[in-house]
Amino acid sequence: MPELPDIVVYIDALRKRILGERLDRVRIASPFLLRTATPPVGDAEGKTVVQLRRLGKRICIGLGGDSDIWLVLHLMIAGRLHWRKGDAKVSPPRGLAAFDFAGGTLLWTEAGSQKRASLHVVAGEDGLSALDPGGLEVLESDLGRFAAVLTSANHTLKRALTDPRLFSGIGNAYSDEILFEAQLSPFALTQKLKPDQIERLFAAVRASLLQWTERLRREAGNDFPEKVTAFRPGMAVHGRYKEPCRRCQAKIQRIRYAANETNYCPICQTAGRLLADRALSRLLREDWPRTPEELELLTRERR
Protein backbone atom coordinates (compact mmCIF):
# COMPACT_ATOMS: atom_id res chain seq x y z
CA MET A 1 0.00 0.00 0.00
CA PRO A 2 1.40 3.43 -0.86
CA GLU A 3 2.43 5.12 2.39
CA LEU A 4 3.39 8.66 3.37
CA PRO A 5 6.53 9.00 1.18
CA ASP A 6 4.73 7.55 -1.86
CA ILE A 7 1.64 9.71 -1.34
CA VAL A 8 3.72 12.87 -0.92
CA VAL A 9 5.55 12.19 -4.18
CA TYR A 10 2.27 11.47 -5.98
CA ILE A 11 0.93 14.82 -4.75
CA ASP A 12 4.13 16.59 -5.85
CA ALA A 13 3.63 15.21 -9.36
CA LEU A 14 -0.07 16.09 -9.40
CA ARG A 15 0.60 19.69 -8.35
CA LYS A 16 2.79 20.15 -11.41
CA ARG A 17 0.08 18.78 -13.70
CA ILE A 18 -3.39 19.62 -12.40
CA LEU A 19 -3.20 22.45 -9.85
CA GLY A 20 -5.04 25.39 -11.39
CA GLU A 21 -6.43 23.20 -14.17
CA ARG A 22 -10.09 22.48 -14.89
CA LEU A 23 -11.38 18.94 -14.44
CA ASP A 24 -13.25 18.34 -17.68
CA ARG A 25 -14.62 14.86 -17.08
CA VAL A 26 -14.67 12.01 -14.57
CA ARG A 27 -14.99 8.49 -15.97
CA ILE A 28 -15.65 5.72 -13.45
CA ALA A 29 -15.22 2.22 -14.84
CA SER A 30 -15.55 0.14 -11.68
CA PRO A 31 -18.88 -0.19 -9.85
CA PHE A 32 -16.97 -0.86 -6.62
CA LEU A 33 -14.92 2.34 -6.58
CA LEU A 34 -17.34 5.12 -5.62
CA ARG A 35 -18.23 4.81 -1.92
CA THR A 36 -19.85 8.18 -1.20
CA ALA A 37 -21.10 10.83 -3.61
CA THR A 38 -22.54 13.74 -1.68
CA PRO A 39 -22.43 15.90 -3.77
CA PRO A 40 -22.66 13.78 -6.95
CA VAL A 41 -19.37 13.13 -8.71
CA GLY A 42 -20.64 14.95 -11.78
CA ASP A 43 -20.64 18.20 -9.80
CA ALA A 44 -16.84 18.10 -9.82
CA GLU A 45 -16.72 18.36 -13.60
CA GLY A 46 -15.99 21.83 -14.89
CA LYS A 47 -14.43 22.95 -11.62
CA THR A 48 -10.80 23.99 -11.14
CA VAL A 49 -8.34 22.17 -8.89
CA VAL A 50 -7.40 24.63 -6.15
CA GLN A 51 -5.83 22.35 -3.54
CA LEU A 52 -4.04 19.03 -3.19
CA ARG A 53 -3.65 17.51 0.24
CA ARG A 54 -2.65 14.28 1.96
CA LEU A 55 -5.00 12.77 4.53
CA GLY A 56 -3.21 9.79 6.04
CA LYS A 57 -2.68 7.51 3.05
CA ARG A 58 -5.35 9.28 1.00
CA ILE A 59 -4.91 11.82 -1.80
CA CYS A 60 -7.37 14.71 -1.60
CA ILE A 61 -8.15 16.89 -4.62
CA GLY A 62 -9.99 20.11 -3.78
CA LEU A 63 -12.09 21.73 -6.52
CA GLY A 64 -13.97 25.01 -6.74
CA GLY A 65 -13.22 28.47 -5.43
CA ASP A 66 -13.38 27.48 -1.76
CA SER A 67 -12.59 23.78 -2.24
CA ASP A 68 -16.31 23.16 -2.02
CA ILE A 69 -15.88 19.66 -3.49
CA TRP A 70 -13.20 17.14 -2.54
CA LEU A 71 -12.28 13.99 -4.41
CA VAL A 72 -10.66 11.65 -1.88
CA LEU A 73 -8.66 8.81 -3.41
CA HIS A 74 -7.66 5.84 -1.24
CA LEU A 75 -5.38 3.57 -3.26
CA MET A 76 -5.27 0.73 -0.69
CA ILE A 77 -2.80 -2.09 -1.42
CA ALA A 78 -2.84 -2.42 -5.19
CA GLY A 79 -4.18 0.91 -6.45
CA ARG A 80 -1.83 3.06 -8.54
CA LEU A 81 -2.01 6.37 -10.41
CA HIS A 82 -0.68 7.09 -13.90
CA TRP A 83 -0.46 10.23 -16.03
CA ARG A 84 -1.34 9.86 -19.70
CA LYS A 85 -1.41 12.37 -22.52
CA GLY A 86 -4.80 12.79 -24.17
CA ASP A 87 -7.94 10.82 -23.35
CA ALA A 88 -6.54 7.57 -21.98
CA LYS A 89 -8.67 4.47 -22.19
CA VAL A 90 -9.85 3.14 -18.83
CA SER A 91 -10.46 -0.59 -19.14
CA PRO A 92 -11.89 -2.74 -16.35
CA PRO A 93 -11.17 -4.86 -14.44
CA ARG A 94 -7.76 -3.24 -13.92
CA GLY A 95 -8.87 0.27 -14.83
CA LEU A 96 -10.93 1.98 -12.13
CA ALA A 97 -11.35 5.60 -13.19
CA ALA A 98 -9.99 8.43 -15.30
CA PHE A 99 -9.93 12.16 -14.56
CA ASP A 100 -9.60 14.18 -17.76
CA PHE A 101 -7.85 17.55 -17.93
CA ALA A 102 -6.82 19.65 -20.93
CA GLY A 103 -3.19 18.60 -20.52
CA GLY A 104 -3.74 14.90 -19.90
CA THR A 105 -5.57 12.22 -17.97
CA LEU A 106 -5.04 10.94 -14.46
CA LEU A 107 -5.63 7.20 -14.75
CA TRP A 108 -6.38 5.07 -11.70
CA THR A 109 -5.74 1.32 -11.83
CA GLU A 110 -5.83 -1.54 -9.35
CA ALA A 111 -4.15 -4.91 -9.76
CA GLY A 112 -5.71 -8.15 -8.50
CA SER A 113 -9.25 -9.30 -7.97
CA GLN A 114 -9.86 -7.68 -4.57
CA LYS A 115 -11.24 -4.25 -5.39
CA ARG A 116 -10.43 -2.35 -2.21
CA ALA A 117 -9.52 1.08 -3.60
CA SER A 118 -12.14 3.74 -2.91
CA LEU A 119 -13.25 7.16 -4.11
CA HIS A 120 -15.22 9.48 -1.84
CA VAL A 121 -16.79 12.71 -3.08
CA VAL A 122 -17.48 15.05 -0.17
CA ALA A 123 -18.44 18.67 0.40
CA GLY A 124 -16.07 21.11 2.06
CA GLU A 125 -13.81 20.76 5.07
CA ASP A 126 -16.50 19.11 7.16
CA GLY A 127 -16.87 16.30 4.64
CA LEU A 128 -13.11 15.89 4.48
CA SER A 129 -12.76 15.82 8.27
CA ALA A 130 -15.27 12.98 8.48
CA LEU A 131 -12.82 10.77 6.55
CA ASP A 132 -9.82 11.62 8.73
CA PRO A 133 -8.81 8.66 10.95
CA GLY A 134 -7.17 11.18 13.28
CA GLY A 135 -3.64 9.83 13.42
CA LEU A 136 -0.75 12.04 14.52
CA GLU A 137 1.39 13.63 11.80
CA VAL A 138 4.77 12.72 13.27
CA LEU A 139 6.68 15.08 10.97
CA GLU A 140 4.65 17.95 12.45
CA SER A 141 4.87 16.74 16.05
CA ASP A 142 7.28 17.03 18.97
CA LEU A 143 8.60 14.21 21.13
CA GLY A 144 6.14 14.84 23.97
CA ARG A 145 3.07 14.57 21.77
CA PHE A 146 4.50 11.50 20.02
CA ALA A 147 5.16 9.78 23.35
CA ALA A 148 1.66 10.56 24.61
CA VAL A 149 0.00 9.03 21.54
CA LEU A 150 2.36 6.04 21.48
CA THR A 151 1.67 5.11 25.10
CA SER A 152 -2.05 5.91 25.12
CA ALA A 153 -2.73 2.16 24.91
CA ASN A 154 -0.53 -0.89 25.41
CA HIS A 155 -0.06 -2.18 21.86
CA THR A 156 2.86 -3.84 20.11
CA LEU A 157 5.02 -1.33 18.27
CA LYS A 158 4.08 -2.81 14.92
CA ARG A 159 0.37 -2.42 15.63
CA ALA A 160 0.74 1.07 17.07
CA LEU A 161 2.78 2.46 14.18
CA THR A 162 0.38 1.10 11.56
CA ASP A 163 -2.84 2.16 13.31
CA PRO A 164 -4.14 5.18 11.34
CA ARG A 165 -6.01 6.37 14.43
CA LEU A 166 -2.67 6.76 16.22
CA PHE A 167 -0.17 7.69 13.49
CA SER A 168 -0.81 9.05 10.02
CA GLY A 169 0.56 7.58 6.81
CA ILE A 170 2.65 4.67 8.17
CA GLY A 171 1.97 1.14 6.94
CA ASN A 172 3.53 -2.29 6.81
CA ALA A 173 6.62 -1.43 4.77
CA TYR A 174 7.88 1.73 6.43
CA SER A 175 7.06 0.48 9.94
CA ASP A 176 9.55 -2.34 9.32
CA GLU A 177 12.18 0.18 8.25
CA ILE A 178 11.44 2.46 11.20
CA LEU A 179 11.75 -0.34 13.76
CA PHE A 180 15.01 -1.51 12.24
CA GLU A 181 16.39 2.03 12.36
CA ALA A 182 15.31 2.31 16.01
CA GLN A 183 16.66 -1.19 16.81
CA LEU A 184 13.38 -2.17 18.46
CA SER A 185 11.33 -5.36 18.30
CA PRO A 186 8.01 -5.19 16.42
CA PHE A 187 6.51 -7.05 19.40
CA ALA A 188 7.76 -4.61 22.05
CA LEU A 189 4.85 -3.16 24.04
CA THR A 190 4.39 0.58 23.87
CA GLN A 191 3.76 1.10 27.58
CA LYS A 192 6.86 -0.92 28.49
CA LEU A 193 9.28 1.26 26.53
CA LYS A 194 11.92 3.29 28.33
CA PRO A 195 12.20 7.04 27.63
CA ASP A 196 15.37 6.59 25.58
CA GLN A 197 13.65 3.94 23.44
CA ILE A 198 10.72 6.28 22.76
CA GLU A 199 13.15 9.04 21.83
CA ARG A 200 15.01 6.66 19.53
CA LEU A 201 11.76 5.57 17.89
CA PHE A 202 10.63 9.18 17.37
CA ALA A 203 13.93 9.99 15.67
CA ALA A 204 13.67 6.85 13.52
CA VAL A 205 10.14 7.67 12.34
CA ARG A 206 11.16 11.15 11.29
CA ALA A 207 14.43 10.07 9.68
CA SER A 208 12.91 7.15 7.77
CA LEU A 209 9.93 9.09 6.40
CA LEU A 210 12.00 12.15 5.44
CA GLN A 211 14.83 10.16 3.86
CA TRP A 212 12.51 7.97 1.82
CA THR A 213 10.42 10.92 0.69
CA GLU A 214 13.51 12.70 -0.60
CA ARG A 215 14.84 9.53 -2.18
CA LEU A 216 11.58 8.91 -4.06
CA ARG A 217 11.49 12.54 -5.16
CA ARG A 218 14.97 12.19 -6.65
CA GLU A 219 14.02 8.95 -8.38
CA ALA A 220 10.88 10.47 -9.93
CA GLY A 221 12.50 13.74 -10.96
CA ASN A 222 10.09 15.58 -13.24
CA ASP A 223 8.38 12.37 -14.33
CA PHE A 224 5.17 10.99 -12.89
CA PRO A 225 6.01 8.27 -10.32
CA GLU A 226 5.31 4.93 -11.97
CA LYS A 227 7.44 2.63 -9.81
CA VAL A 228 5.39 2.80 -6.63
CA THR A 229 5.95 -0.39 -4.65
CA ALA A 230 6.24 -1.59 -1.06
CA PHE A 231 9.42 -3.49 -1.91
CA ARG A 232 12.40 -1.32 -2.78
CA PRO A 233 16.03 -2.39 -3.26
CA GLY A 234 17.31 0.17 -0.77
CA MET A 235 15.18 -1.06 2.11
CA ALA A 236 16.99 -2.47 5.12
CA VAL A 237 14.60 -5.26 6.15
CA HIS A 238 11.19 -5.04 4.48
CA GLY A 239 10.86 -7.70 1.79
CA ARG A 240 14.37 -9.01 2.50
CA TYR A 241 13.58 -12.32 4.21
CA LYS A 242 16.69 -14.54 4.48
CA GLU A 243 18.94 -11.82 3.06
CA PRO A 244 21.85 -10.57 5.22
CA CYS A 245 21.32 -7.64 7.56
CA ARG A 246 23.32 -4.64 6.41
CA ARG A 247 24.51 -4.03 10.01
CA CYS A 248 25.33 -7.47 11.40
CA GLN A 249 24.97 -9.88 8.43
CA ALA A 250 22.42 -12.06 10.27
CA LYS A 251 19.58 -13.33 8.09
CA ILE A 252 16.50 -11.14 8.05
CA GLN A 253 13.51 -12.98 9.54
CA ARG A 254 9.77 -12.67 9.08
CA ILE A 255 6.46 -12.95 10.90
CA ARG A 256 3.52 -13.85 8.68
CA TYR A 257 -0.08 -13.07 9.56
CA ALA A 258 -3.08 -12.97 7.24
CA ALA A 259 -1.86 -11.34 4.02
CA ASN A 260 0.94 -9.36 5.69
CA GLU A 261 4.53 -10.06 6.58
CA THR A 262 6.73 -8.26 9.09
CA ASN A 263 10.48 -8.37 8.56
CA TYR A 264 13.12 -7.77 11.23
CA CYS A 265 16.71 -8.51 12.18
CA PRO A 266 16.92 -10.91 15.16
CA ILE A 267 20.32 -9.57 16.22
CA CYS A 268 19.74 -5.83 15.85
CA GLN A 269 16.14 -5.78 17.06
CA THR A 270 15.31 -8.76 19.30
CA ALA A 271 18.59 -9.55 21.10
CA GLY A 272 19.10 -12.73 19.09
CA ARG A 273 15.61 -14.12 19.76
CA LEU A 274 13.39 -15.35 16.93
CA LEU A 275 9.80 -14.15 17.03
CA ALA A 276 7.24 -16.89 16.47
CA ASP A 277 5.98 -17.00 12.90
CA ARG A 278 2.32 -17.96 13.21
CA ALA A 279 2.26 -20.38 10.29
CA LEU A 280 5.47 -22.20 11.23
CA SER A 281 4.96 -22.17 14.99
CA ARG A 282 1.63 -23.98 14.59
CA LEU A 283 3.44 -26.62 12.58
CA LEU A 284 6.52 -26.98 14.79
CA ARG A 285 4.87 -26.31 18.18
CA GLU A 286 7.43 -26.99 20.93
CA ASP A 287 10.19 -27.41 18.32
CA TRP A 288 10.01 -23.71 17.40
CA PRO A 289 13.63 -22.42 17.37
CA ARG A 290 14.52 -19.65 19.78
CA THR A 291 17.63 -18.28 18.05
CA PRO A 292 18.94 -17.87 14.47
CA GLU A 293 21.43 -20.66 15.18
CA GLU A 294 18.67 -23.10 16.20
CA LEU A 295 16.69 -22.13 13.10
CA GLU A 296 19.69 -22.81 10.87
CA LEU A 297 20.23 -26.22 12.51
CA LEU A 298 16.54 -27.12 12.18
CA THR A 299 16.57 -26.11 8.52
CA ARG A 300 19.55 -28.36 7.82
CA GLU A 301 17.95 -31.30 9.63
CA ARG A 302 14.76 -31.02 7.58
CA ARG A 303 16.49 -30.94 4.20
Can you annotate each of these PLM segments?
Residues 22-40, 53, 58, 65, ...:
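Basic, nucleic-acid-binding surfaces and adjacent catalytic neighborhoods in DNA/RNA-processing proteins
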Residues 68-184, 189-192, 196, 201:
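Phosphate/anion-contacting hairpin/loop surfaces
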Residues 1-129, 267-275, 281-303:
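Acidic, proline/glycine-enriched N-terminal capping motif
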